[in-house]
């Protein structure tokens, strides 16, 4: 007899249906439906998780309304002690509501509220090994993880975890193909059925009917390696691939969350599910952690990192612009760093230093170097050449993060894997590269610009999993977009420390750009997607305090963007608009607007615009 349990909000169980098969080999299937708190089954607007145990095999599918965004997909793991992918029997379950509030120092939102329903399904394999699968369902997604509640060592050699996205779904996938685990590739946009059977890095974005699905990973630490997906050539299902022959941990093991953001495009673009699932902050005192803008000389003048005088010039410019930091990249000299730090401090600018990951490999190296940097007065480190998702590297992260917190050093990882909720657990992480960014637009003979679609895909893919150090607003780079579109990246791309990478002279030649760049924040109290089509259009509204900003970027022909301003609170507002003039140069215009207005801005081919909104008392003409 088929048995079915309906867990509304994962808290209410119908009284007669939770009869469990006596054995995982029973011929009947037991099914459960999990919903977000306060949601009834088939309500439609939010995702539902459908779990089935059929002939000893566990599967998960996900629906949103009438749309199946994830077809029945295998769950389970294989350990050194046995195969936990088949022959499974349920030994019990438990449920609890999740209600949390937390703060982050960076991101699309700084204050967070989590409401989710959690169900733990306890299972036993044919060999007697026990484990659990923990599911969470919220209004914006579904996630699960495996738990081994044992004080002994656990060795996971394989996960059966798969994601059977409908083959007709549109997909935006990042090939994991360059051998460096640095996520510096360009997304491939095709239906699932036409994607190559290779490995892909997170996050993976899919358009399924009227719904969007993003697959990603959260809460990774040294007990596990960072996974990726591989598309099977025959089945066209995505299997989860581990980076090591085995992931080994002592004591209770909780694997990272296998997470799916599900909803309309605005739900996906605004979601903070990746930090909602991450472990709480390990730091009691975060007063020393301060996001901001950084001047950076390496992009425009590589050898300048070795010149004290050049670095002072960038400090002077940062001070003039009101930017908080200057980053000194590879080539700095220890003999003059204390002088530079004092020079910068006198101008209210902090100094970040570049560091090769190799000098942080051991406890003694970390203690020696981090203490030296802190004694100099350095505020943060850009650690480069991380280049691995393997478990030995995630253990390294644990050590580096703890040591940097001890010495009050903020961090930015380059040549590194994507963040997976790290900014909640370790708030001193201001950003991570993990993107084919502006370093690849640095002028040199024969260099071709990135496809314009790359720029307009990133807000819906890479930036969803955490702060992204693209190092934007490089007017003198090899690029496909207009100047208005390039300037708008300062608003469209989110990074806790935002490095505007062009030369001082390039910015000084564009006073319109300087006006925006001297004011634009790097962290946001609120973010809303106003319009979007990955690879074609992205229009975001972001709030910092009482001020709102809009950033819009497009791919394609010149057009006019009409943006309703319903996100503004009641009252009269001034809009300072930064876009492309008829001659291709940046222009600024000002309009008085209200929440009932629509902003109509002509946009050049592959263009964009940015706008700053402030409340306008009578007679005000600027913000």
What does each model-identified segment do?
Residues 330-482:
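Aromatic- and carboxylate-enriched substrate-binding clefts and catalytic-loop regions
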Residues 30-276, 585:
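N-terminal accessory beta-strand-rich subdomains and adjacent acidic, glycine-rich linkers
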Residues 591-623:
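C-terminal beta-strand-rich structural cap/linker in extracellular carbohydrate-active enzymes
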Residues 250-325:
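An acidic-aromatic substrate-binding cleft motif
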Residues 1-26:
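Secretory targeting and sorting signals
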Residues 533-570, 609-610:
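Carbohydrate-binding surface patches
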Residues 146, 318, 384, 411, ...:
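Conserved, mostly hydrophobic/aromatic
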Residues 502-549, 583-584, 588:
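Glycan-recognition and catalytic regions of carbohydrate-active enzymes
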């Amino acid at each position: 007899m088929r048995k079915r349990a309906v867990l509304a909000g994962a808290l209410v169980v119908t009284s007669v249906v939770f009869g469990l098969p006596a054995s995982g080999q029973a011929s009947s299937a037991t099914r459960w439906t999990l919903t977000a708190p306060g949601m009834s089954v088939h309500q439609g607007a939010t995702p539902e998780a459908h779990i089935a145990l059929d002939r000893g095999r566990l599967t998960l599918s996900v629906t949103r309304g009438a749309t199946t965004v994830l077809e029945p997909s295998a769950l389970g793991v294989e350990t050194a002690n046995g195969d936990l992918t088949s022959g499974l029997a349920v030994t019990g379950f438990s449920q609890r509501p999740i209600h949390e509030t937390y703060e982050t120092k960076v991101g699309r939102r700084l204050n967070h509220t989590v409401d989710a329903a959690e169900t733990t399904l306890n299972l036993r394999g044919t060999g007697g090994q026990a484990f659990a699968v923990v599911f969470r369902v919220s209004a914006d997604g579904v996630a699960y993880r495996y738990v081994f509640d044992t004080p002994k060592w656990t060795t996971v050699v394989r996960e059966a975890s798969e994601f059977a996205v409908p083959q007709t779904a549109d997909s935006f996938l990042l090939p994991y193909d360059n051998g460096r685990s640095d996520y510096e590739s360009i997304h491939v946009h095709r239906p699932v059925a036409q994607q190559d059977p290779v490995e892909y890095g997170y996050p993976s974005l899919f358009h399924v009917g009227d719904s969007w699905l993003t697959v990603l990973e959260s809460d990774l630490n040294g007990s596990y390696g960072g996974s990726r997906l591989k598309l099977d050539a025959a089945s066209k299902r995505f299997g989860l691939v581990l980076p090591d022959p085995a992931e080994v941990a002592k004591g209770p093991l909780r694997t990272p969350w296998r997470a799916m953001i599900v909803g309309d495009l605005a739900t996906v673009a605004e979601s903070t599910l990746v930090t909602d699932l991450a472990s709480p902050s390990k730091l009691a005192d975060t007063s020393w952690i301060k996001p901001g803008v950084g001047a950076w000389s390496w992009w425009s003048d590589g050898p300048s990192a070795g010149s004290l005088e050049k670095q002072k010039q960038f400090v002077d410019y940062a001070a003039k612009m009101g930017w908080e930091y200057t980053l000194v990249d590879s080539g700095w000299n220890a003999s003059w760093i204390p002088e530079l730090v004092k020079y910068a401090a006198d101008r209210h600018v902090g100094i970040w230093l570049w560091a090769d990951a190799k000098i942080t490999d051991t406890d003694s190296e970390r203690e020696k170097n981090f203490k030296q940097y802190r004694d100099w007065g350095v505020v943060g480190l850009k650690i480069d050449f991380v280049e691995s998702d393997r478990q030995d590297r995630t253990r390294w992260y644990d050590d580096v993060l703890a040591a940097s917190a001890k010495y009050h050093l903020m961090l930015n990882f380059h040549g590194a894997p994507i963040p997976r909720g790290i900014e909640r657990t370790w708030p001193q992480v201001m950003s991570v590269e993990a993107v084919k960014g502006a370093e690849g637009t640095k002028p040199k003979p024969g260099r071709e610009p990135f496809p314009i679609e790359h720029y307009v895909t990133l807000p819906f893919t890479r930036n969803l999993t955490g702060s992204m150090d693209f190092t934007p607003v490089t007017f003198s780079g090899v690029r496909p977009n207009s100047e208005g579109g390039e300037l708008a990246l300062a608003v469209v791309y989110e990074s806790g420390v935002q490095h505007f990478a062009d030369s001082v002279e390039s910015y000084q030649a564009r006073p319109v750009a300087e006006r925006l760049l001297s004011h634009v924040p790097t962290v946001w109290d609120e973010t809303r997607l106003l319009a979007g089509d990955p690879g074609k259009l992205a229009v975001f509204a972001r709030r910092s305090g009482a001020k709102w900003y809009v950033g819009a970027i497009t791919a394609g022909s010149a057009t006019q963007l009409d943006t309703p301003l319903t996100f503004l609170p009641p009252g009269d507002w001034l809009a300072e608009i930064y876009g492309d003039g008829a001659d291709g140069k940046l222009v600024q215009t000002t309009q008085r607007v209200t929440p009932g207005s629509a902003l109509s801005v002509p946009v050049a081919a592959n263009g964009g615009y940015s706008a700053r909104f402030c409340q306008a008392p009578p007679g005000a003409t600027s913000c």
